Amino acid sequence: MSSLAKQKQEKQMNGYLLSFGVCAAAAFFIFLPFLVVDKGLFQYCGDFNSQQIPFYTYMNGFVKNSAGQWSWETDLGTSAVNSYSFYLYGSPFFWLTTLLPQAWVPFSMVPMFMLKFGVAGLGAYTYLKRYSAGRNYAVIGACLYALSGFTVYNTFFNHF
């Protein structure tokens, strides 16, 4: 591989890292005031507090400790796959939380959001680098996408 090709490859790799890092760091600063006020927890509103955090916490323990697919703690008893696949089972971010102890799950929401924003920026950069005039334009576009009002507003819908 020529020296010029290596430099171009390193520059592209730096674009991936830069997009991920800037978006994840921006998410940290977006959520930092909430972390300080709520002592490590991220309390939002509505379904996030009453569904998302309890679902994550419950299914974290269920996946680790349950023998079978039937959940007696959900309604009058139901299949966990049928009840939670929309919210959790299809999300790679949920599966990352299963690496943590169940008690830590509510405190892992902000790191998961940081990871999600970083991955959104990484994905946008991957797409935009093919169509932009240069790496910097692709990084700016990735940050604009990952930190857009659409993405920030939809933190409420944690399962997407």
What are these regions (language model features)?
Residues 125-147:
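Transmembrane-helix signature of polytopic, membrane-embedded enzymes
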Residues 26-121, 143-160:
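Membrane-interface coil-to-helix junctions
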Residues 1-35:
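Start-transfer (signal-anchor) and selected internal transmembrane alpha helices
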Residues 10-17, 103-106, 110-113, 132-135:
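Membrane-water interface of alpha-helical transmembrane segments
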Residues 20, 42, 135:
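Residue-level detector of functional hotspots within protein domains
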Residues 19, 116, 121-124, 130-131:
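Functionally constrained cores in energy, signaling, and assembly domains
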Residues 13, 76-77, 137-139:
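Short hydrophobic "helix-edge" motifs at membrane interfaces and signal-peptide entry regions
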Residues 17-21, 111, 139-143:
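Hydrophobic alpha-helical transmembrane segments
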